[in-house]
Curated annotation (Swiss-Prot):
Pfam families: XPG_I_2 (PF12813). It comes from Schizosaccharomyces pombe (strain 972 / ATCC 24843) (Fission yeast). One of its GO terms (biological process) is DNA repair. Belongs to the asteroid family. Signal peptide: none annotated. GO terms for molecular function: nuclease activity. Keywords: Cytoplasm, Mitochondrion. This is Asteroid homolog 1. It comes from the Eukaryota.
């Protein structure tokens, strides 16, 4: 979150910096990247359409490959393992605001996608810390003599004295094929231009966790605020504006002399919201399910896949006694944020046991999609075939003969149900005992379940064509795509006996003979 207005106030104090894509010698410094900030910045800077998860995956890979060419000593991506309870009300307010803002749906999925793609496909160094990433980023930057990429004004206030340290705001970056330029900030260099401690300015503007009775100046200009603080320090009246206790707290907030930082990294295999659940200091433990694109009048997409998550919670509970036997889930219900308390005192079960070892003859990307469709209720053959066409087309890299369409409300609901289900299956995979896992870790990280083979625009376009009576064979451009899609479809329908058949789209329509043909 950072300190309100501090980044804007101190923007002129940055110095230009440039990193060439073709350096003659390796750089003397490392690079530490705030994972969540990077994920959101890239999503918005690339103008990603909410349905194009695969396009976002490509953007993540391309940017990492560009950074790799800059020849830093090391590149580390650091992701959150959970938010402190002090941000609970902020989180509640933001969640509620987004319920009625369909444009913001799916955005939070960019963080687990970026983490999985970087760790698995890019083979980058990914670290997950047990709380927010920002303080651990500063800790690692000091340890590695690194530059930090982030979008958090808190980094302006860490007094790190290593030779090459600096904070570069992501929004200051100008990225080209020849390199990256931006603006670099250091606390010690900025401090030289002020006659009072910059932490006093931060405390005056309001640092996270400040006392509720602290009077914060929301309106004065930067110059006027600096004049007030400078005169107050000179006249020794500063405690009338910022108490001694609050200033001590702010200095401690930006101190890196915390022994917990030495042991704050945790399992990088799991996505942040699952890590947050496991490392929650609350009883019961809490999980915030990502918001999806759905109308407030519709049923919550997460309810359908609740049994999958229940088994995941039970597995965590059996392996970690301190986890407890209850979980509090936050999710959307109608047009408001809701929560429910779940008892998770059940026996341990692997993914394959939970899903009855279905589709075991398929490799994991195909099996995950088949599992997802099998767990969705009231599915019809057109919807199922459209998802399979989307998946196979992207998996094989084969285009389809499709036109842009306006998604129907029914199809939007199907997409959100699909995401909720595949996310819940991944949580079940995370919950397995790694020594007795039924799923190969290497196979799971070799593709990103939320982006490798998902582009929901293709689903909407395929569904639109199939609803008009078109055959899947008229949509695909090669026999391999058609054959693989049909094999997956047959396996699904053989197991999913109650799938609703709208029309026999796979059976080619016979051409009626005309009198001319008969003659």
């Amino acid at each position: 979150m950072g300190v309100p207005r501090l980044g804007r106030f101190l923007e002129p104090f940055g110095k230009p910096v440039y990193f060439s894509s073709y350096p003659e010698v390796p750089l003397n410094c490392s690079l530490v990247i705030d994972g969540p900030s990077f994920a959101f910045w890239l999503w918005f800077s690339q103008g990603i359409v909410c349905s194009d998860f695969q396009g976002y995956q490509k953007a993540v890979l391309d940017f990492h490959h560009l950074l790799s060419r800059l020849r830093f000593k090391e590149i580390e991506y650091i992701f959150d393992g959970g938010l402190p309870f002090s941000k609970h009300q902020v989180r509640v307010n933001r969640y509620q605001q987004k319920i009625n803002d369909l444009r913001s749906a799916y955005i939070n999925l960019c963080v687990p996608i970026a983490q999985h793609v970087l760790m698995g496909l890019a083979k980058a160094k990914v670290i997950v810390c047990n709380e927010e990433a920002d303080k651990y980023c500063a800790f690692q930057a000091k340890k590695l003599d690194a530059v930090i990429l982030s979008q958090d004004s808190d980094f302006l206030l860490y007094d790190i004295d290593t030779p090459h340290y600096g904070y570069i705001p992501l929004q200051s970056l100008d990225v080209t094929s020849n390199g990256i330029s931006g603006r670099k900030y250091r606390f010690d260099e900025i401090q030289k231009d002020f006659h009072f401690d910059l932490h006093i300015l931060a405390a005056y503007l309001g640092v996270e966790g400040h006392p509720l009775d602290l009077v914060i100046d929301y309106h004065n200009t930067f110059e006027h605020i600096c004049k007030i603080l400078e005169n107050s320090v000179k006249d020794k009246f500063i405690e009338k504006l910022v108490s001694k206790e609050e200033l001590t707290r702010v200095h401690a907030f930006y101190s890196l002399n915390d022994l917990k930082l030495e042991t704050s990294t945790i399992n990088t295999f799991m996505w942040g919201r699952v890590q947050e659940l496991l490392n929650s200091q609350l009883q019961p433990a809490e999980i915030w399910l990502p918001q999806l694109l759905e109308l407030p009048s519709k049923h919550c997409s997460w309810l359908e896949s609740a049994p999958l998550r229940l088994q995941a919670y039970a597995n965590f509970s059996k392996q970690m006694p301190e986890f407890g036997t209850e979980v509090l889930e936050y999710f959307r219900l109608s047009d408001r944020l809701s929560k429910r308390l779940i008892s998770v005192d059940y026996d341990y079960a692997t993914v394959c046991e939970t899903l009855d070892s279905k589709f075991s003859n398929w490799n994991l990307p195909h099996r995950l999609v088949l599992w997802t469709l099998r767990c969705m209720k009231n599915l019809n053959n057109i919807t199922a075939t459209s998802f399979l066409l989307m998946h196979v087309s992207l998996f094989l890299g084969s285009p389809m003969n499709l036109q842009p369409v306006e998604p129907t409300q029914e199809d939007i609901a199907s997409v959100s149900r699909f995401i909720a289900t595949i996310y819940s299956i991944c949580m079940l995979i995370f919950s397995e005992d790694k020594e007795q896992s039924s799923i190969s870790f290497q196979e799971f990280v070799s593709f990103s379940p939320l982006s490798s083979t998902l582009n929901f625009a293709l689903f909407h376009q395929a569904a639109s064509k199939l609803k008009t009576g078109k055959s899947p064979l008229s949509i695909v451009t090669d026999k391999t795509t058609a054959s693989l899609t049909y094999k997956m479809y047959k396996d699904l329908t053989n197991d999913y006996s109650d799938i609703y058949m709208i029309m026999d789209i796979w059976k080619p329509k016979r051409k009626r003979k005309t009198k001319k043909d008969q003659s």
